[in-house]
Amino acid sequence: MSNSFFGRFKKRDNKVVEEHLPIREDRIFWVETLQKIAFPVLNNLKKGSLKKNMSLEASNSESNKIAHLEAFANVFNGIAPWLELGPDESEEGGLREKYILLTLKAIGNAVDSNNNDYIIFTENKQSLMSIALFAQGLLRSKTQIWNNLSMDVQARIIYELKNTRIIAPFENHWLLFTSMIEATLLEFTGECDKERLTYGVRKFRDEWYLGDAIYADGPEFDVNYYNSIFIHPMLNDILKIMRKYSIGEGELLDVQLMRSSRYASQLERIISPEGSYPLLGKSLTFRCGVFHLLSQASLFKILPRNIEPSQVRSALTKVLETQFEGYQNFDDKGWLSIGLNGHQIEIAENCINTGSLYACCTIFLPLGLSFNDSFWVDPFEEWTTLKAWNGNLVESDQSIDF
C-alpha cells in the first residue's frame, strides 16, 4: 500500500485537495487503523494461508474451531460500507479498489471446499453468529461485493446460508442471526424461510422491548452492550429488507430507527473525555465494537438533532486513538490479542477467541459516508462528556416512551 496515502488524500495526479479541511487527518487515521486491523485477515485469506498464519488464543480451546470464520466475518461486516463506496479517482478510492479485490478473492477461498481456508460452513452452533455477520456484510456491500462475485461463488454462498437452517438459535439475540440470514436470502434469491425471518423480530417487538430504546436480550434482562453490538443494528438492516418486500413486520422500521436514534445518543454520552467507557457486561473484548449502533446511526444519518455528526466523529476518533494508536492490542505478529486495552485474557468469556476480537471493526461503518459528508467535513466538536467536564453547555438527557 502506498505510504503517500497517509500524508493527504490527493487526486492521483494533482496537488493536495482542500488541505484546510480538518476531516483529512481524522479520516486518514480511521483508514490507517482499518488497514492495521483488517489487512492481515484479508490478505492471508486471499492467499489461502489464514489457518496457517493466524494467531490463535482462547479462554476455552473449543472456541478456536471457528476463530478463522469469526475473524473474517467480523472484518467484512465492519468494512463493507466503506467497500460499497467503490473506487474513485482519489488515493483512498484507489485503496478501496484494492480492498474490494482482496475481499472478493478472500470470499471465493472461504466458500471453496477445496481451499485450505474453506471456513464459511456450518461447523457448529456457534458458527451461526459468524455466518449471520457475513450475511449482513453482503447486504451492506451488495453493489461492490455481491454483484461482483462469480455465479459459482454466489451459489456456494446461498448453499451455505441455507445450511444454517439446521441450527436452532437460542431465545435471545441469536434469533436475529437467523432473521439476518433469511433477509439476505430474500434479497439475493427472492425466497426465504418466512418463519425464521420474522420470529425473532416479533419477539423483540412484542415481548422484549423494555422502554427508552432498550431491549432485553431474551426473557431476562442483563446489563451489557448487546443492544449496540447486535440487537439494534441487526433489527435495522433486517427491517429494511422486510419493508422492501412488503412483509408485515417491516412496519416496525420507522419506530425502530427512532429507537436507534435515542440509543445512539445514550452511547455518545458514555464516551469519557479520555475516550474510555464503562465496562459493563459481556464481550468487552470486542473493544470499540461496542459502539456498533452509534456508528450505524451515523451512517444512516439518524443521529438526534441535538448531536452533531462531527461530535460523534470526534468522540469515536478518541476511542480509536485510545485503543489502536499504539500496538498494545496486537501480538508480535500483528494479530489482535485478547483484552480491552492490552493483553487481558481474564476479561474474556469462554466463547471468545482471537477471531471474536475483530468485532471491533464495526466502528468503521461511517467510512461508508463520502469524505465530503458533514460527518467528516465539519470541524472537531466536543462530545457530551467533554463539554460537561469542561464546564460548557450541555442539554438535559431526554428519554422516549415509544
Protein language model features and the residues they cover:
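Beta-strand-rich domains and repeat architectures in extracellular enzymes and scaffolds
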Residues: 64-77
